[in-house]
A protein has these predicted regions:
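N-terminal amphipathic, basic helical "cap/leader" segment at the start of enzyme domains
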Residues: 1-81, 176-177
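C-terminal helix-cap and adjacent tail motif
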Residues: 5-13, 18, 22, 142, ...
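Helix-biased detector of long, well-ordered alpha-helical tracts
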Residues: 17, 86-93, 175-176
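Small-aliphatic-rich amphipathic alpha-helix that forms the alpha element of a beta-alpha
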Residues: 33, 83, 90-136
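Solvent-exposed alpha-helices and their adjacent loops that cap or buttress functional pockets
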Residues: 40-43, 74-77, 140-146, 165-166
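Short, charged/polar surface micro-motifs in flexible loops or helix N-caps
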Residues: 53-58, 89-91, 158
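Short, solvent-exposed amphipathic alpha-helical segments in soluble enzyme
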Residues: 65-67, 99-101, 138, 168-170
Length: 177
């Protein structure tokens, strides 16, 4: 297995060529999302929305720029595909489980994209803006009982992916023996 190499190659991509994913690439990424761990196996409480329609990507990009207070910003980075993860609104006590599930799905999709040589970046600001915009949420066909949790932008990267050295020192580790 080459899992650690894929992990070492995965990085946030903020510059895309504009080339759309092939159907096979998209299906591989969606398979990775569907292989993610989901709390209590409640896959019915999760939803993926694949956005490739340019006018909707532009609306989401503008909503994100407004959220950040910078109209010149392009928080989707020109990616031709954005996949939104949404979680069923199961109430405040369980909502965090859906957001954790979404994070696992995003990571699996990012690793699958890396394995395919595609660029990806985890998106939050545009998704927070989406969650606050009922009309845009409706345009994205996200049901009223689902909350946009996170998203991933995907596409052919303008910068080649480079393998990084992996370390155990970036994050504080406390060994309790």
């Amino acid at each position: 297995m080459e899992t650690m190499k894929t992990i070492a190659m995965r990085q946030s991509c903020r510059e895309y060529t504009g080339e759309q994913l092939t159907e096979a690439e998209l299906n591989t990424v969606l398979e990775a999302a569907n292989a993610s761990p989901v709390g209590m196996g409640k896959f019915e409480d999760m939803m993926l929305t694949v956005v490739q329609k340019k006018d909707l990507l532009e609306k989401l990009d503008k909503a994100g720029a407004k959220f950040y207070g910078n109209p010149d910003m392009h928080p989707l980075y020109g990616a031709p595909t954005v996949i939104i993860t949404s979680a069923r609104d199961t109430g405040i006590d369980r909502r965090m489980v859906g957001f954790c599930n979404a994070a696992c799905m995003i990571e699996n999709m990012a690793l699958a994209a890396t394995d395919l040589g595609l660029g990806s970046v985890y998106l939050m600001g545009s998704i927070m803006a989406l969650g606050a915009d009922a009309e845009l949420k409706k345009d994205m066909k996200i049901p009223a009982d689902f909350i946009p949790a996170s998203a991933i932008a995907l596409g052919a990267t303008a910068q080649p992916l480079k393998e990084r050295d992996l370390t155990v020192t970036k994050i504080t580790v406390d060994h309790i023996k």
